[in-house]
Each structure stands twice: as structure tokens, then as C-alpha cells.
Amino acid sequence: MFKLFTARQHDKIWDFDGGIHPPEMKLQSSTVPMRIAPLPDQLIIPLQQHLGPEGELRVRAGEQVLKGQPLTVGRGRTVPVHAPTSGMITAIAPHTTAHPSGLAELCVHITPDGEDRWREQQPWADYRQRDKMALLDRIHQAGIAGLGGAGFPTASKLQGGLNGIITLIINAAECEPYITADDRLMQEHADEVITGIHILRHLLQPQQVLIGIEDNKPEAIAALQRALRGQDDIHLRVVPTKYPSGGAKQLTKILTGKEVPFGKHSSSIGVLMQNVGTVVAIKRAVIDDEPLIERVVTLTGDALSSPGNFWARIGTPVLYLLKLAGFKPQNPPMVIMGGPLMGFTLPSLDVPIVKISNCILAPAETEMGLSEPEQSCIRCGLCVDACPAGLLPQQLYWFSRGEEHEKARNHNLFDCIECGACAYVCPSNIPLVQYYRQEKAEIRALDQESARAAEAKARFEAKQARLAREKLARELRHKQAAVKLTDADQQTVDAAVSRLTRQSDGSESVINIPAGQMPDNSAVIAAREARKAQARARQAEKQQARSTEETTDIVDPRQAAVAAAIARVKAKKAAQVQHVTTDVAEAGSEAIAEDPRKAAVAAAIARVKAKKAAQVQHVTTDVAEAGSEAMAEDPRKAAVAAAIARVKAKKAAQAINPD
């Protein structure tokens, strides 16, 4: 009885609040075997196909590549992309990608050569001989991201779960209508699914491994049971069909009874989840050394004559796949990537298949129902009952329309999984998920702006602090420089301190002079005489330097010639003055001999002439001095001064001897 109770507890499943039961519409594609899509004429590989930044390019246009060759560098959370086949890189240019915005992203354009040649491969037959970090690096370099739709880098997710993981859950629910990619993958490749689970179990060492699958996939359930025969370490749990039971938080609640707290991931409660398609990709990367270059894509809808699931290379244009399934264009044209609840209408059919593209839905004109206009909310509360995350969709709608961002955030807008259950049950046809997506984008933009502003403020404050530190350091250096002593000053101070220390210690005795005796000042007198001798020597050196400079000043030949001319003029004038004085004296003597009165007159005239001669001599001396100064300044000025002196001397001579 106890064993039966334990078994029932072991297989127990729980339920989550909310959820809906839309038409499944899976039989169109789940009953048809998978097909391999041929290579298209051109492959378009976007550089970013995961959550995180795009990788750095490793190739150039015009380069030949091989199948499986990496096109970008994978570092950190950057997942590399690989060449899906061998061929020529014709261009590296922007192209419209699978996104609701329809914006162009950088892509690598490859023209296949038809040979499909692989790069060198290194399979690992026994992965258990490899350490965990080598396995994680292998998974990362294979470019594996979550194939269930989130696109989170798988290696990063696994590395975060190396410690503390209690339960490993394999998500095989595939709850959204129309999509059957995982269903067919489990039916045809159940052995690879189980092998991939063993690799994850070797990495994470969880206490239990659970596979959650909805009860509307009997063929897949049977295939997994056959693959698990004889293995009791992996438990298959069949859960009731209910949308969105494939959500990470919802499936965790169903299988473990635990709820993931608001704002956190399932790893916070010891649970790690991986999609079935991701598990197969891990097996092929680790054991077969095959990077993620293809995936299973469901092509379904009434606009297709041959729906089914295809192995499609990453980068295959959507229109090419639709033609393989017998696409019949509708009016108005509408092709959805993803399911009818969580998918989005493609802006163009030239967009390529990426790693998270699990379904291409091409409905007929009447298949999705007539489009009805949006009406006002009637506050019926059906959206609250349908929400599997336990949110208040009606309140979030009002906050989103009113741009009340903080209120929307506080009401846990980011816990919305965008499943579309609220919009599905809304009688007013309000596209609630679109409002939530737009509000999330606006809040993220505001957060980024706030982060940039905070970074700018932090940089400004850091700069101000640095400038303040530099100013203080500068002032300190100036203070230190102001009080810093030279070596000589320091020696003097040290000597004085030493003398004071010796005196205080008594080591230096004071000299006492007895009364009636004179102190011996011979040393002081000798020092004074030495200083005087040094002063006299310096004075003699200065005089010698001045005489040398004067001698050097007369070295110029032109200056010497001018000086000689001035000397001759002075000598000539002196001779003339002497001759005039002699004549006057003789005339006076003759006049005295003849008449005393005439003698007096002659004497007066002689005195006047002598006075004029003295004035002429004084002028000549001034002119000579001026000429000497001009000569010292400029040779040309000296010549002019000499000419002027000669003219003045001539006039003076004429004044003395008018006759």
C-alpha cells in the first residue's frame, strides 16, 4: 500500500491557474513524415539569431566557405553562426529579417556550390571522458540557442545551472495550435532525444529528470517510451492538453508543484528546462560535431496544398519553403511566423529561416476568421481568468494606454509571457499583447536612457573628484616646495642643531677668558683677511675685464680712423689758438711801445680773441666727444659727426680771422 502511494505521489502532476483550450489544428502536419528541403539558390544568414549581441565577422565577401564553418566569433553570450552549406559568400549586407518591425539586419549571403562539403569534423564517441567545461565550450561554439522560441544561449544557461539544479525538465509539450515540429522530431528521432538528455544529465547532475508532454501526442509518447525502455532514471510525464502548458513557469508548476517567484527564473527554485529540439541539437554538436545549421520547421495552413514538417537549412528564404509545400497566395496575403497566438505577420516573404523559427503558418482567407475592429473594454474580467501568469491584463492595458510606466512595472508587466490567452478571450477584440509589447519596449528604452544618464553623471562626478584630488595634490606640492631647504641651508641648520645638542648635552664646553687677558681672535682675523683678499681679487678681475672690453671696442679699423682724424683736428685747432695768442701779444707789445692808450685797446682786443679761441676749443672738444659717442654707436654716424665737426671748426676759424 505504501509503495502504491509513493508511486502515485511520484507521478503526480499539478495544474496552473488560467489557460485556454483553442482548436489544436495539428493534424494537418503531424501525420506526415518529415521531409528534407533542398538547397535554395541563395542562403541569407543573419548575424544575430539569439538573445544577446551579434558576433564579430570572420569571413569576407568573395570567400569560399565549407559546410559548418563558423562565420562569426562566439564570445561570452555571443553565439556564433555557421555556413549551412559549402559555397561562395556573395555579399555581407543588410537584409530584412524575421521580426515584426521589418527592419534590416546585417546578413551573410551565400551562394551554394551544390557540393555540400563539410569542414573537418571531430566526433566525440565517448563524451563522458571530457570535462564539463570542454562540453560547454563545444555546445557554445556549435552556436546552439534555445529552439523553443526564446533564443537564449544554451551554453550560458547550462553554465548557470552547474550548481544547485535539482530537477531537469525536458519541454515536449508544444502547446500552441498548428505547430508540430517537436511532435514529429520525437516520433522520428526519439533515440537522439534520449541521448541528448543523457549528455545534459552528465553535465548538470540533477536529482531527477522529467519529460513533460501533452496527451494529444500519442505517437510521440509511444516513441519516447520505446526509447526509454529499461531506463528508470528519466521519467516521462503526460500532462493534460491546455494552453499554455508549454510555458516554462507553467510546465514547472505542472510537473513539480513549485511556482517561480515574480521577476525570477526557474533556476531560482532548482529547476532547469530545455526544449526537445535543443536537446537534439546538443546531441549532434557534442557527439557528431555538427553545429546548428538546420532545424525542423512546420509548414501548415489551408493556403498550402502539401503541409508538413521540413528539415530546413538556416538562412533558407520563407518563400522558397512555402513553394515546396504548395503555397497558394491569398488576398490579402498573410503569412505568420510562429503560431496563431504568439506569432507575428511577416513583413516580407524574402526573410530567412532563423534558429527560433519553428513554424510558418499560411492560412486561407477565412481560416483565421474575419478581422473585427477594436472596441472599448467592457471590464468583463475574462482576461483575468485566462491569464496563466496570475496578472491583471485589464489594468496593464489601461496603464499601457495611459503611458503610466511605473504602474505597469509595479503590476509585474514583465512577468507577462505574451501567450495571447487574454487577447483570445477578449470580447472587444482588443490586441492586448500588442499593447504589452509596446509598453515593454518603451520601458526598456526609458531604462536605457536612465542608465546612460546615470553613467554620464557617474563620469562627471568621477571627473570632479579627480580634479579635486589633483588640486589638493598641487597645493600640497606647492607648500612642500615653499618650505623645502637647499642643501647648504640644510647643512647650516643641521650644524646649528648639532651645536645646540652638544651644548645641551655638555659635550661642547664653554671657553672662559680670565680677567685681564684678551681672547685669541687670530682665526677670526685670518678669515676676515682672506675674505678681503678674495674681494680685491674679484675687483681686479672686473677692472681687467672692463679694460679688455675697452680695448676690444677700438679694434674696429673704421673707428680707429675716425679717432685719429678727431685727434688731428684737435691738434690743428690748438696750434691755431697758440698762433693767434702769439700775434696778439706781439701786436700789444708794439702798441705799448708806441702809445699807452693804443696798448690798452690792443690788450682788450687780445682778451676778446683769447676768449673766442677758448670757446672754439670748447666746441671742438664737445664735437670730438660727440663724434666719439657716435663712433661707438655706429660707424656711419661717426663719419657724419666728423664732417659736422670739421665744418664747425672751419666756421670758428673764420670767426677768429675774418680777414
From Swiss-Prot:
The name this protein goes by in its record: Ion-translocating oxidoreductase complex subunit C
EC numbers, comma separated: 7.-.-.-
Pfam families: Complex1_51K (PF01512), Fer4_7 (PF12838), RnfC_N (PF13375), SLBB (PF10531)
GO biological process, one term: electron transport chain
Cofactor: [4Fe-4S] cluster
Record-level Gene Ontology MF annotations: 4 iron, 4 sulfur cluster binding; electron transfer activity; metal ion binding
Record localization: Cell inner membrane
InterPro entries from the UniProt entry: 4Fe4S_Fe-S-bd, 4Fe4S_Fe_S_CS, Ion_transpt_RnfC/RsxC, Nuo51_FMN-bd, Nuo51_FMN-bd_sf, RnfC_N, Soluble_ligand-bd
Xref: SUPFAM superfamilies: alpha-helical ferredoxin, Nqo1 FMN-binding domain-like
UniProt membrane topology term: Peripheral membrane protein
Top-rank EC class of the record's enzyme: translocase
Positions that bind [4Fe-4S] cluster 1: 377, 380, 383, 426
Keywords tagged on the record: 4Fe-4S, Cell inner membrane, Cell membrane, Electron transport, Iron, Iron-sulfur, Membrane, Metal-binding, Repeat, Translocase, Transport
Residue positions binding [4Fe-4S] cluster 2: 387, 416, 419, 422
Gene3D superfamilies xref list: 3.30.70.20, NADH-ubiquinone oxidoreductase 51kDa subunit
SUBUNIT field: The complex is composed of six subunits: RnfA, RnfB, RnfC, RnfD, RnfE and RnfG.
Cofactor notes: Binds 2 [4Fe-4S] clusters per subunit.
Source taxon at top rank: Bacteria
Keyword Chloroplast (UniProt): no
Family designation: Belongs to the 4Fe4S bacterial-type ferredoxin family. RnfC subfamily.
Biological role stated in the UniProt entry: Part of a membrane-bound complex that couples electron transfer with translocation of ions across the membrane.
Taxonomic lineage of the native organism: Bacteria, Pseudomonadati, Pseudomonadota, Gammaproteobacteria, Enterobacterales
